[in-house]
């Protein structure tokens, strides 16, 4: 998160309930205080945008801006998706390196991301390449094994129905998956109906409505619209809904839900009056 009181970009660990998710702040750390291990340089500005908890540790998906010293103050510069690994319950992380680089590596460019799902022993992550919203994947076992050793494993971008997942995650070409919106969000697969769900949002850019939409898929590649969670006109430009997450009914946030789950999303996150809203999705109805 960005916090002027703590000198800029910081990372926060909190505890709470489904009704009060930020009830208790455990700690606030800067990048060098959180990423204390590893052999890869801490290049750029880091935001942990999602985590996957496993029996062996916690895998963090990191949105990286200003990679390779690129960009100007307030700009994204070159952007990446990176990985981190924690074996102490998220109190410190090893930065493993970058796994996704946009095609042709434009500067500036915002890759957004990174919702993920686990499907058929693969991890799928979603991000914006230069073609639009797309997906890359890697075998779960390989990702975790490499992470434990302080490394990354190869990820492959989706490059169309004929070629499939056959393009290098680190700069290869990709094909958009046909839906769009801001992808600083979350995804999960349901044990109730074996479908997966992906959130996308939009703020009030150029006077358009702000919204949170839910999409569904059976394979992680072909997505269709499921429902609008909220849609409204925003009072000012650059206001509205952004940064959404999916939480299971039992309070877990690990890419798996049952028949009922909660959606949380910030509104007007750049304003003093920002708030977090909560909605319930019941797949049995």
Enumerate the language-model features and the residues they cover.
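Conserved beta-strand position repeated once per blade in WD40 beta-propeller domains
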Residues: 48-50, 113-116, 184-186, 243-245
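A short, acidic, amphipathic alpha-helical segment used as a generic capping/interface helix at domain edges
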Residues: 240, 245-251
């Amino acid at each position: 998160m960005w916090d002027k009181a703590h000198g800029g970009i910081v990372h926060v660990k909190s505890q709470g309930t489904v009704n009060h998710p930020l009830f208790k702040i455990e700690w606030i750390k800067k990048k060098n205080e959180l990423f204390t291990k590893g052999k890869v340089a801490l290049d750029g500005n880091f935001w942990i945008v999602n985590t996957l908890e496993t029996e062996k540790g916690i895998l963090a998906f990191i949105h990286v801006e200003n990679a390779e010293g690129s960009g100007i103050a307030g700009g994204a510069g070159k952007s990446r998706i990176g990985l981190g690994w924690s074996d102490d319950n998220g109190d410190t992380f090893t930065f493993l390196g970058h796994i996704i680089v946009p095609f042709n590596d434009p500067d500036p460019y915002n890759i957004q991301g990174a919702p993920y799902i686990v499907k058929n022993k693969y991890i799928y992550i979603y991000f914006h390449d230069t073609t639009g919203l797309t997906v890359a994947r890697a075998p779960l076992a390989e990702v975790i094994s490499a992470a434990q050793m302080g490394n990354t494993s190869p990820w492959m971008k989706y490059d169309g129905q004929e070629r499939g997942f056959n393009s290098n995650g680190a700069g290869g070409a990709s094909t958009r998956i046909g839906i769009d919106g801001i992808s600083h969000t979350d995804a999960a697969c349901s044990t109730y109906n074996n479908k997966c769900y992906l959130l996308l949002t939009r703020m009030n850019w150029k006077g358009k409505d702000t919204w949170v939409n839910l999409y569904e898929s059976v394979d992680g590649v072909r997505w269709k619209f499921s429902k609008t969670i909220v849609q409204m006109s925003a009072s000012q430009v650059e206001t509205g809904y952004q940064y959404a997450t999916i939480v299971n009914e039992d309070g877990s946030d690990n890419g798996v839900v049952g028949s009922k789950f909660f959606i949380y999303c910030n509104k007007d996150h750049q304003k003093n009056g920002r708030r977090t809203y909560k909605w319930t999705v019941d797949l049995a109805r």
